[in-house]
Curated annotation (Swiss-Prot):
Chief subcellular location: cytoplasm
Name of the molecule in the record: G protein-coupled receptor kinase 5
Residue interval(s) of motif Nuclear localization signal: 388-395
Family: Belongs to the protein kinase superfamily. AGC Ser/Thr protein kinase family. GPRK subfamily.
Purpose: Serine/threonine kinase that phosphorylates preferentially the activated forms of a variety of G-protein-coupled receptors (GPCRs). Such receptor phosphorylation initiates beta-arrestin-mediated receptor desensitization, internalization, and signaling events leading to their down-regulation. Phosphorylates a variety of GPCRs, including adrenergic receptors (Beta-2 adrenergic receptor), muscarinic acetylcholine receptors (more specifically Gi-coupled M2/M4 subtypes), dopamine receptors and opioid receptors.
Broad enzyme group: transferase
Length: 590
């Protein structure tokens, strides 16, 4: 039994390391899998794609790179891209160097005598920016100038881009992105844990070698528990949120027995494991502060979409290979209608906010209470209203949440104690973060005085702890309890509508990011020599016919031999070819 676990872990670790070869986990046929269609095959896509500048040229990673490549071939536009890059660097510059970096940008791009002067930013706006720089430089100094540049680029340059070979290449990438996703898209590895409707296992995309976690939701288990709306809600929320601090959904597909969510893999274990199983319970304040800041950024991204998470607790915060965290398991998250409040007594005992326990209407406030619980537990080594391994009834824990004050030990600095008390204020209207400014108000608390959130959000700060790359931070394979077989539930065609809403294939932004991170984009995104069209982009150059398989070539040779002696062999030959074609397709999709 121990051998089975060792083998499963060894295979997983080898996959995480890229298989040890030059392909870094990619299939031998990865270029064939990601072969561009001929541009003539993309005409339907060209007609139907939403031609929105922000989506095509900024939000979508592959689109952003291709628009940049287009601009770099136009002498008048190259400086605009360089300006945007310089501002992005400015925004993550340490505070003490902002003035120096700001002056550099002003001189290079916003001074008329400069060879790369940005002509489309108005003189009044330049003067206002210069005045703010002299008074006190801030991260948002060039925001209005950036908006002005984008306003210009979304005009004539964008329309020229839509007629260029770079947009044609984007259509080819979109065509690949929209290809069907099945279980054969992935290699499957060991079980990592279990969710409410099925197991979670590690998997790897054959074409790119990228590792993910596959959350399997068993169809019969969903139907038996009437969990369709909950499963679809989680999928749609994951699809909507693109944050480096929340697990991302990359693919959604179905098999005969399950619906599958393919998510960011987090190999470093959860916060509960690290709080209680790595030496003395709890963290040094510096480490707790770093995780709290990243959790706060994740909440901010969710709240930006008007989504309240409602289940903050250590086991739902996962670490990646580098020690950064992400919020996971969005099963209880819900989107709040604009200008409305919701009601729902959901969450985990000891972490639910007073307004949730009292079944009152609320907005985003429960998440700031949950953040307070997490900061307290990371520092103290136990949750604020329940001792470690304390056996106590749910009603008693709820009473403590509603009526008692948390106790602070010597482990808390004054700033840490202050932020916890302000986040654990029982009246939601008085709670830190629950005013109009939301997360921005929490970021200004003295606890985060030395945290550069711009650099944190850009992934430029080193975590205080890095997980061991040779360790598998999950239970042994045989210790993960298996689900029992679901009996008395039959699947039929009435379930198909739900399955079709769920199984939508690749999610654009994560899929495109995967192509870039695994260097597939760099290797495949090749044009003709000296900026000319590659054959697959040449409309007058017909696409190559598909290569015939061995059986087809043999049948053709047989037909040629038979045709010399039999005038009626044509029908027989067509029958052979059609039979072989069906057989070949069946094999390819298995």
């Amino acid at each position: 039994m121990e051998l089975e676990n060792i083998v499963a872990n060894t295979v997983l670790l080898k996959a995480r390391e890229g298989g040890g070869g030059k392909r870094k986990g990619k299939s031998k046929k990865w270029k064939e899998i990601l072969k561009f269609p001929h541009i003539n095959q993309c005409e339907d896509l060209r007609r139907t794609i939403d031609r929105d500048y922000c989506s095509l040229c900024d939000k979508q990673p592959v689109g952003r790179l291709l628009f940049r490549q287009f601009c770099e071939t136009r002498p008048g536009l190259e400086s605009y891209i360089q300006f945007l890059d310089s501002v992005a660097e400015y925004e993550v510059t340490p505070d003490e160097k902002l003035g120096e970096k700001g002056k550099e940008i002003m001189t290079k791009y916003l001074t008329p005598k400069s060879p790369v002067f940005i002509t489309q930013v108005g003189r009044d706006l330049v003067s206002q920016t210069e005045e703010k720089l002299l008074q006190k430089p801030c991260k948002e100094l060039f925001s209005a100038c950036v908006q002005s540049v984008h306003d210009y680029l979304r005009g004539e340059p964008f329309h020229e881009y839509l007629d260029s070979m770079y947009f044609d290449r984007f259509l080819q990438w979109k065509w690949l992105e929209r290809q069907p996703v099945t279980k054969n898209t992935f290699r499957q590895y060991r079980v990592l844990g279990k969710g409410g409707f099925g197991e979670v296992c590690a998997c790897q995309v054959r074409a790119t070698g990228k590792m993910y976690a596959c959350k399997r939701l068993e169809k019969k288990r969903i139907k038996k528990r009437k969990g369709e709306s909950m499963a679809l809600n989680e999928k749609q929320i994951l699809e909507k949120v693109n944050s480096r601090f929340v697990v991302n959904l990359a693919y959604a597909y179905e098999t005969k027995d399950a619906l599958c969510l393919v998510l960011t893999i987090m190999n470093g274990g959860d916060l509960k494991f690290h709080i209680y199983n790595m030496g003395n319970p709890g963290f040094e304040e510096e480490r707790a502060l770093f995780y709290a800041a990243e959790i706060l950024c994740g909440l901010e991204d969710l709240h930006h979409e008007n989504i309240v998470y409602r289940d903050l607790k250590p086991e739902n915060i996962l670490l990646d290979d580098y020690g950064h965290i992400r919020i996971s398991d969005l099963g209880l998250a819900v989107k709040i209608p604009e200008g409305d409040l919701i009601r729902g007594r959901v969450g985990t005992v000891g972490y639910m906010a007073p307004e949730v326990l009292n079944n009152q209407r609320y907005g985003l406030s429960p998440d700031y209470w949950g953040l307070g619980c997490l900061i307290y537990e990371m520092i103290e080594g136990q949750s604020p209203f329940r001792g470690r391994k304390e056996k106590v009834k749910r009603e008693e824990v709820d009473r403590r949440v509603l009526e008692t004050e948390e106790v602070y030990s010597h482990k808390f600095s004054e700033e840490a104690k202050s932020i916890c008390k302000m986040l654990l204020t029982k009246d939601a209207k008085q709670r830190l973060g629950c005013q109009e400014e939301g997360a921005a108000e929490v970021k200004r608390h003295p606890f985060f005085r030395n945290m550069n959130f711009k650099r944190l959000e850009a992934g430029m700060l080193d975590p205080p702890f890095v997980p061991d790359p040779r360790a598998v931070y999950c239970k042994d394979v045989l210790d993960i309890e298996q689900f029992s077989t679901v009996k008395g539930v039959n699947l039929d065609h009435t379930d198909d509508d739900f399955y079709s809403k769920f199984s939508t294939g690749s999610v654009p932004i994560p899929w495109q990011s995967e192509m870039i991170e695994t260097e597939c984009f760099k290797e495949l995104n090749v044009f003709g020599p000296h900026g000319t069209l590659s054959p697959d982009l040449n409309r007058s150059h017909p696409p190559e016919p598909p290569k015939k398989g061995l059986l087809q070539r043999l049948f053709k040779r047989q037909h040629q031999n038979n045709s010399k002696s039999s005038p009626n062999s044509k029908t027989s030959f067509n029958h052979h070819i059609n039979s072989n074609h069906v057989s070949s397709n069946s094999t390819g999709s298995s």
